[in-house]
Amino acid sequence: MKYINYMNIKYWVAALVLSGGLFTACSDDLVVGQVDESGYTTGDGSVMGYISDGNGKRMFTNVEFRSSGDVSFHLKTTGKLSSEATVSVVYDETVLTEYNSKYGTTYEAFPESEVTLGDGGIIKLPVGSVHSSELKVSFVSDGSLEFDKIYIIPLRMKVTSGDFKLGEEDQTRLIFVKDLTGLPDCTKYVDGKPGVKVFSCMEVNDTNPLNNLSFTLKSNGKPLVDCLIIFSANINYNAETGRVYIFNNENVQALLDNREHYLKPLQDRGMKIILGLLGNHDRSGVANMSKETAQAFAQEVKALCDAYQLDGIFVDDEYSDYEYEDITPGFVYPGREPAARLCYEVKKAQPDRWVIAYAYSTTGSLPAIDGMQSGEFVDYALHDYGGSFDLSSSYPGMPKSNMGLYSQEFNLGSTASESNLRSMRENGYLSHMIFAMDPNRSNFEWIQMSAMERMARAFYDDELVFDGIKYPKDWN
């Protein structure tokens, strides 16, 4: 990241024509994101209602499950009602048909026969309350679904009683579902609940990602690492065509081209594969695309993720030479709003994949876009090294469990204490990033290994096991 000298880039990204992709979000967050109700108004003074899932999300709901799973929904209103309010929820495949037609996607419906709507599909809001009890949507595996494919549970919501209105975006809901029955589960559970997710951000110019397989927990054999971030692809600008595009150096491209060898073994153990996106010393970057440019770039991101079966992106606003005057068409003055716009457009283009932000520079805090809080379209926010403050005001609507605290930089020996890591976990912050882990480096035994042993104890009350395998960089 900001301490790494990035190599010169030499190769264009390959043409991306494949389709498909891997699902990426988790339904097991422990702390519900808070929704800012101030933006939900009708303009005529009447009460507005909105539907959120158990993580406080209104925009998209993503879930992975094994054998069976469920998602809860709540009705909230901007004011108390004088009579009981009800909303009916039904499985309606036309919702998916409309979505596929609008966005040019080809998602398939999750079998209706395997979906159960609790309470007869009725959400009830008692008189004098602004928050309903939960409606649970449950689903089971029938053995027919492909594990590497996303399916949709399409729902339609309708007000059946009560003096309030549902916004248009709250009248339908797509649940993006991935059936992982029979596949390894990378999630580490502590006291029956999902524990900390470890994000391993690797500068792959000299490090083999297979090293993430070498570290497991003694009690269950699960990998210490939950997610690999490939650092990094680049955001570049072609002055002749006026196009912003993704540019991979020879090392990133080698891993993508040989994903069966370097990346799929991690996914087979349950890990996610995320591609970093970073500026590259020209006028383009995370924080200065116009709406139209961001929308076009988001489609390129989707094509790349489809082609290489990636699980999402990691945005990092560094190394861009932004224009602050005489700004080129297609760009805007750099700032937090265009950075948020890029994240929003990428999430809209591929809602089943993660958008992760490095909470640094312009992405240290992101505003709402088109009425949606940044915690709706950014799945995880990972602090800069050592950062430990709550990110709720920086990413409104994001669950605490998706905020990464006390990030560590192993190359320079910037590590976290066991007490800080344990405090993080105990306070519900369940995401953590390590950068530049590589057992082939000279500081492995006395810095990296010790740091990961502290992580195993603090996060999981467990012991770290190193299998002794050190994978070298073995591609040209």
Predicted segments — roles?
Residues 2-13:
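Bacterial N-terminal signal peptides that target proteins for export
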Residues 12-20:
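Sec-dependent N-terminal signal peptides
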